[in-house]
């Protein structure tokens, strides 16, 4: 008798995606990050659902409702900090996942890669709107500054900003709609994840060597399920340590002050995972130029498949490209540090240099190095 998981219409889909899926035997632990992202999304949706039961999206009560969750709701503090720090873990996994895609040439599956970029924008939008909900000082001023960037769009900018705000400033209408979208978007993200996997399973996973692996496959279960469970346990351990020992490590102390439109914080900055893009935005003195650079810092990922000039798919056997890749990682860490610093000398010039380096490495140096490595193969 055939196993039910291979015959049942619904179980068959799950079986082909999670049990009997053939995976290249050389796939390393770097490929764990996709599974970890699914776990992060599940944690965020569950904790967010329970937080939404106690949260009120009204400017008069939002800050107090978050305080009430932490003080009076059973394990409310755990829910709140799991959700806040879970977002940080989400972005750590997300950036590792993108980095691994760049390193191993996964962007050659352009449909999967492009859906991934849409997912990145959706997750960033969700995280931004979530940061506004506690209605602290940084929530209010962050929302004001970031939404105000849209006013740089010619002709329609100002009207667009007021349409998003639902008035002439960030107020009750803004908070209510941000809460509605923050609740809705994770489910849209979950649907996009299914599409992402659908496109991935059309082609099958690539592998670190970059050569066809059809003759050398292993079933997903038990080999990769065990590996992924280990990764999830490691991530949950890290998240638990963060939540239980230093829950405010990655937050901003200004967000414990209720939002006050009459008092501007000395240094407005977003959450740490947006600081690299914020640094690129600030490095250009022109408003429209800064906004374009901000958007392009993410959209540049979409042109990476077009700039692939190497005869090899992955960077595994390309040491010069590897050096450039790690230089890009170091550059992003520098930008993240600069984004959290005040706008003064020497941070301004460091930020500008790091921003130029970011685009130069991706758009110029990587394709040029790949072409040089092609010539080296002839020696």
Swiss-Prot record:
Transmembrane segments: 33-53, 77-98, 113-133, 178-198, 226-246, 288-308, 320-340, 347-367
The protein's name: Cytochrome b
Cofactor binding comment, as recorded: Binds 2 heme b groups non-covalently.
Residues noted as binding a ubiquinone in the record, renumbered to the chain: 201
InterPro entries per record: Cyt_b/b6_C (IPR005798), Cyt_b/b6_C_sf (IPR036150), Cyt_b/b6_N (IPR005797), Cytb/b6-like_sf (IPR027387), Cytochrome_b (IPR030689), Cytochrome_b_C_euk/bac (IPR048260), Cytochrome_b_N_euk/bac (IPR048259), Di-haem_cyt_TM (IPR016174)
Note in the entry: Heme 1 (or BL or b562) is low-potential and absorbs at about 562 nm, and heme 2 (or BH or b566) is high-potential and absorbs at about 566 nm.
Function: Component of the ubiquinol-cytochrome c reductase complex (complex III or cytochrome b-c1 complex) that is part of the mitochondrial respiratory chain. The b-c1 complex mediates electron transfer from ubiquinol to cytochrome c. Contributes to the generation of a proton gradient across the mitochondrial membrane that is then used for ATP synthesis.
Subcellular location(s) per record: Mitochondrion inner membrane
């Amino acid at each position: 008798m055939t196993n039910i998981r291979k015959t049942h219409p619904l179980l068959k889909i799950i079986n082909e995606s999670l049990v009997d899926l053939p995976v290249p035997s050389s796939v390393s632990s770097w490929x764990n990050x996709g599974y970890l992202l699914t776990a992060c999304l599940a944690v965020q949706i569950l904790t967010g659902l329970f937080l939404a039961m106690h949260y009120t999206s009204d400017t008069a009560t939002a800050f107090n409702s978050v305080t009430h969750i932490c003080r009076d709701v059973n394990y409310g503090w755990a829910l709140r900090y799991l959700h806040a720090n879970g977002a940080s873990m989400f972005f750590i996994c997300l950036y590792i996942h993108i980095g691994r895609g760049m390193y191993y040439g996964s962007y050659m599956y352009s449909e999967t890669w492009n859906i991934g970029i849409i997912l990145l924008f959706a997750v960033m939008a969700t995280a931004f709107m979530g940061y506004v909900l506690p209605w602290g000082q940084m929530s209010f001023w962050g929302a004001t500054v970031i939404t105000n960037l849209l006013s740089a769009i010619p002709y329609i900018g100002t009207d667009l900003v007021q349409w998003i705000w639902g008035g002439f400033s960030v107020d009750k209408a803004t908070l209510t709609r941000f809460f509605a979208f923050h609740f809705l978007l994770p489910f849209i993200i979950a649907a996009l994840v299914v599409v992402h996997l659908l496109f991935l399973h059309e082609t099958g996973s690539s592998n670190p060597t970059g050569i066809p692996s059809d003759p050398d496959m292993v079933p997903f279960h038990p080999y990769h399920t065990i590996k992924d469970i280990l990764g999830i346990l490691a991530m949950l351990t890290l998240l638990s340590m963060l939540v239980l020992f230093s829950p405010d490590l990655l937050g901003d102390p200004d967000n414990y002050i209720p939002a006050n439109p009459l008092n501007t914080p000395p240094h407005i900055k977003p959450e740490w995972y947006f600081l690299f893009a914020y640094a690129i935005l600030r490095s250009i003195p022109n408003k429209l130029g800064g906004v374009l650079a901000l958007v392009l810092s993410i959209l540049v990922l979409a042109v990476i498949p077009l700039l692939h000039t190497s005869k090899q798919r992955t960077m595994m056997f390309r040491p010069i490209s590897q050096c450039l890749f790690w230089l890009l990682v170091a550059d992003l860490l520098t930008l993240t540090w600069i984004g959290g610093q005040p706008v003064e000398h020497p941070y301004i010039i460091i930020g500008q240099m790091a921003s130029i380096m970011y685009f130069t490495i991706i758009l110029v140096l990587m394709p040029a190095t790949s072409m040089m490595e092609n010539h080296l193969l002839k020696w």
